[in-house]
């Protein structure tokens, strides 16, 4: 299989959002050009991926992966942290970096619960009535405490993009889930109206997940 490489970053995932979407949002926000390679656009995704694995040595044999000058970086969360640090959206100072990472880790916890509900149909009632309002309350309080429209400091970090990506997913299934969380709802709207993010969302190809 031959790919046309146009930019310095080459990002590989399936034709879906999943664990790749936050990374794509980071690229969009930063206006960093990259080659977005998606298995399954023109055929069998898993056949394409299996052929790809024969050509390249991939840590853990899974995607997403980010290739930079022949160096392959794996694990979505590690890629998020790498890009955020590289492009200075990881928080100003050691403590803010910690808080951004703390919120990012929290997002992973609730996103995992949502995926179990959305993809595997597990405990939807419990998620909708207990887990989702509980975690939304956590994020609401963090915004209230920071009191700057952002989760960390007074400017955007990858924590803001991670929370946005989470609720971009959740609101597609539960559109009224933030009605009792005004600060969180306003924050999601704030991020969604950043010009680069707005343009990316408007032009994003639809996918099953």
Curated annotation (Swiss-Prot):
<dbReference type="InterPro" id="IPR050213">
    <property type="entry name" value="GST_superfamily"/>
</dbReference>
<dbReference type="InterPro" id="IPR036282">
    <property type="entry name" value="Glutathione-S-Trfase_C_sf"/>
</dbReference>
<feature type="binding site">
    <location>
        <position position="121"/>
    </location>
    <ligand>
        <name>glutathione</name>
    </ligand>
</feature>
<keyword id="KW-0808">Transferase</keyword>
<comment type="subunit">
    <text>Homodimer. In the absence of ligands two homodimers may interact to form a tetramer.</text>
</comment>
<feature type="binding site">
    <location>
        <position position="125"/>
    </location>
    <ligand>
        <name>glutathione</name>
    </ligand>
</feature>
<dbReference type="GO" id="GO:0006749">
    <property type="term" value="P:glutathione metabolic process"/>
</dbReference>
<dbReference type="InterPro" id="IPR010987">
    <property type="entry name" value="Glutathione-S-Trfase_C-like"/>
</dbReference>
<dbReference type="Pfam" id="PF14497">
    <property type="entry name" value="GST_C_3"/>
</dbReference>
<dbReference type="InterPro" id="IPR040079">
    <property type="entry name" value="Glutathione_S-Trfase"/>
</dbReference>
<feature type="binding site">
    <location>
        <begin position="62"/>
        <end position="63"/>
    </location>
    <ligand>
        <name>glutathione</name>
    </ligand>
</feature>
<feature type="domain" description="GST C-terminal">
    <location>
        <begin position="93"/>
        <end position="209"/>
    </location>
</feature>
<dbReference type="GO" id="GO:0004364">
    <property type="term" value="F:glutathione transferase activity"/>
</dbReference>
<comment type="function">
    <text>Conjugation of reduced glutathione to a wide number of exogenous and endogenous hydrophobic electrophiles. May also function as a storage protein or ligandin for parasitotoxic ferriprotoporphyrin IX (hemin).</text>
</comment>
<protein>
    <recommendedName>
        <fullName>Glutathione S-transferase</fullName>
        <ecNumber>2.5.1.18</ecNumber>
    </recommendedName>
</protein>
<feature type="binding site">
    <location>
        <begin position="75"/>
        <end position="76"/>
    </location>
    <ligand>
        <name>glutathione</name>
    </ligand>
</feature>
<feature type="domain" description="GST N-terminal">
    <location>
        <begin position="7"/>
        <end position="91"/>
    </location>
</feature>
<dbReference type="InterPro" id="IPR036249">
    <property type="entry name" value="Thioredoxin-like_sf"/>
</dbReference>
<dbReference type="InterPro" id="IPR004045">
    <property type="entry name" value="Glutathione_S-Trfase_N"/>
</dbReference>
<dbReference type="Pfam" id="PF02798">
    <property type="entry name" value="GST_N"/>
</dbReference>
<dbReference type="InterPro" id="IPR004046">
    <property type="entry name" value="GST_C"/>
</dbReference>
<feature type="binding site">
    <location>
        <position position="109"/>
    </location>
    <ligand>
        <name>glutathione</name>
    </ligand>
</feature>
<comment type="similarity">
    <text>Belongs to the GST superfamily.</text>
</comment>
